[in-house]
């Protein structure tokens, strides 16, 4: 595992750093995507990134990217990490949805959507999770049925939940059940849908952090053309894996959120630094942060060799959520009576730790629960036997389900 940049990578890093220094404001904590000013700021920033060639570094040049390497993409993410950039609004679309479209869609679809998404003109969301499915992506009940009018269109009905950014999105990719007579992994089909269709109702979920990043989405008699299908009929699981693989490859910066700001705050508080218990905690968090950094280095090494990162990356998320909980909890305690402040308008520095603290429990669910990730580590890293599956060869319609 090589921790150092090659000369070419070092030159690219310097180029990225110079551009960010000139264009991006410094920050300590992420922006709240639910705030009214987030959308216009995000679109301006995305357009600037696209114009400079940093919006989608690994995309082919024919589609507006640099044709760069995954390592260059990671380098940019590392360098952008310490800056206050409203990029999260586009991360799902550009990191997961559009790469799926580029992999399986026809040329007309790619030509229509790739450019506008890259420039921030259109926003995408991912409609996967359902209320009854839990962490089982394949337990999809949302139905897509061929219209009986001979048009070849599909009619979609169902419900999705925990859809990030749906309230801002123009389009989404949706996984549906098209054949309930076969086992659950074989009867799914993916489509893209217009989120402004009258049959699409988005209900933001109010979080205890005060924001509403996640949404319930109700789909009622939404008609889609067969040309909106992504992949073959019944190949939805295979296409979903393309999306999930790209999610894993959407690598963020090496430093966990909040660490530089917390360290600076602790150094600026002499009485805090006299606290032996706090110094011990700082040492523990440093070790965790370094462990996460070296895990990312393993990912970068794999990418530089043209390999796909392995399931070891699941370890990083488990460690990260524990780390963020401990870090934000200590930050709130250090603020004493000011720790109850949750309005950035009153004090951005005081409100940020509480936002992280109350938002962290949701991170344990997003992108794979702790339990799912531990199963992945047990089965794919440690080689332990997998859970017994009794539904492997059972038609989806015959599977037992709750009332």
Language-model features: where?
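Amphipathic, small/basic residue-rich leader segments at the start of a protein or domain
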Residues: 1-91, 112, 116, 251-252, ...
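Alpha-helix capping/hinge segments and adjacent helical runs
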Residues: 22, 50, 66, 247, ...
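Internal helix-loop-helix
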Residues: 50-121, 165-171, 247, 289, ...
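A short, Trp-centered hydrophobic/proline-enriched beta-strand micro-motif
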Residues: 120-128
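A short core secondary-structure module
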Residues: 141, 152-203
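A structural signal for short hydrophobic beta-strand segments in well-ordered beta-sheet cores
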Residues: 142-146
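Glycine-rich beta->alpha junctions and the first turn(s) of the following alpha-helix
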Residues: 200-295, 363, 399-403
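Short, charged, amphipathic alpha-helical segments
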Residues: 279-283, 311-318
């Amino acid at each position: 595992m090589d921790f150092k940049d090659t000369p070419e990578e070092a030159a690219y890093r310097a180029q990225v750093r110079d551009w960010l220094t000139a264009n991006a404001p410094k920050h300590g904590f992420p922006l709240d995507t639910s705030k009214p000013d987030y959308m216009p700021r995000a679109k301006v920033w995305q357009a600037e990134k696209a114009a400079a060639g940093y919006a989608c570094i690994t995309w082919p040049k024919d589609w507006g990217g640099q044709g760069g390497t995954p390592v260059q993409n990671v380098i940019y993410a590392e360098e952008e990490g310490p800056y206050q950039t409203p990029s999260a609004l586009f991360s799902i679309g550009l990191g997961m949805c559009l790469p799926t479209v580029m992999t399986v869609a026809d040329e007309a679809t790619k030509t229509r959507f790739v450019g506008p998404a890259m420039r921030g003109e259109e926003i995408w969301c991912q409609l996967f999770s359902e209320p009854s499915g839990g962490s089982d992506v394949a337990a999809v009940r949302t139905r897509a049925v061929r219209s009986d009018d001979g048009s070849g269109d599909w009619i979609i009905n169902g419900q999705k939940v925990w859809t990030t950014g749906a309230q801002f999105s123009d389009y989404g990719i949706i996984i549906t059940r098209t054949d309930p007579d076969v086992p659950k992994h074989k009867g799914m089909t993916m489509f893209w849908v217009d989120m402004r269709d009258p049959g699409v109702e988005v209900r933001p979920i109010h979080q205890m952090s005060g924001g509403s990043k996640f949404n319930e989405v109700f789909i009622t008699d939404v008609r889609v053309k067969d040309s909106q299908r992504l992949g073959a009929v019944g190949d939805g699981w295979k296409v979903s894996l393309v999306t999930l693989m790209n999610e894993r490859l959407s690598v963020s910066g090496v430093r966990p959120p909040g660490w530089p700001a917390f360290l600076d705050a602790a150094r600026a508080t002499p009485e805090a630094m006299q606290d032996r218990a706090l110094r011990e905690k700082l040492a523990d968090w440093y070790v965790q942060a370094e462990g996460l950094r070296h895990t990312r280095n393993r990912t970068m090494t794999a990418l530089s060799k043209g390999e796909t990162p392995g399931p070891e990356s699941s370890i990083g998320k488990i460690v990260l959520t524990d780390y963020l909980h401990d870090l934000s909890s200590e930050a709130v305690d250090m603020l004493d009576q000011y720790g109850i402040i949750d309005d950035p308008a009153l004090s951005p520095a005081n409100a940020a730790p509480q936002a992280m603290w109350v938002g962290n429990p949701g991170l344990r669910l997003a992108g794979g629960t702790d339990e799912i990730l531990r199963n992945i580590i047990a089965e794919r890293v440690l080689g332990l036997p997998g859970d017994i599956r009794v539904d492997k060869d059972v038609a989806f319609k015959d599977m037992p389900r709750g009332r």
